[in-house]
Amino acid sequence: MFFPKFKDERENGMKYTRSLDLSRFRFIDELTELVPGVFLFPSVDIIDRKDTHFERFWIQKEDGSRVPDTFPDELAMVLVEPEGLSILSACSHRGITNILRTVRTAFPELPCNLLLGGFHIHNAEESKYQVIADYLHEYLPQKIGVCHCTGVDKYAFFYKDFGDRIFYNHTGKLIQTDSLL
């Protein structure tokens, strides 16, 4: 479960030690409602492989061999409100469009009010940006907050294409939704 993870040659994951108290973890392997209206999605189907970001990431197995990390443990969190969804992702290695498709399958009738997360396309070729932008034009969230691994370079592209719908998110930013006012 806790295999060492790497980006290139640098260890890049949560280090497992025998002293780690696993009783403090809640392992999620199916769509789970944590509290009323807050859902965790532990499984994101890869529908569009062009929007995946696995390059240079590896897992070291017990025998010392390395296999590509496809981030099967990546989660997305969704706040479901009567007027729509707020979707929170981390670095979206499995693809933000794939995350959106997975969430839309569970809640097809609700619009996306907020999409917040990293898209992991910093320094990526423009075609990676275009895959995401094309999908977001089709399924347009009211607000899109991009985080650090999207990159300032790609944030500029998003701002050009989406205007005031997009903002650059940062640590400590307070975002309120209508039901939490």
Model feature map: region roles:
Residues 1-75, 162, 167-181:
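Metallo-beta-lactamase
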Residues 67-76, 80-87, 91-171:
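Cap/insert and terminal regions of metallo-dependent hydrolase folds
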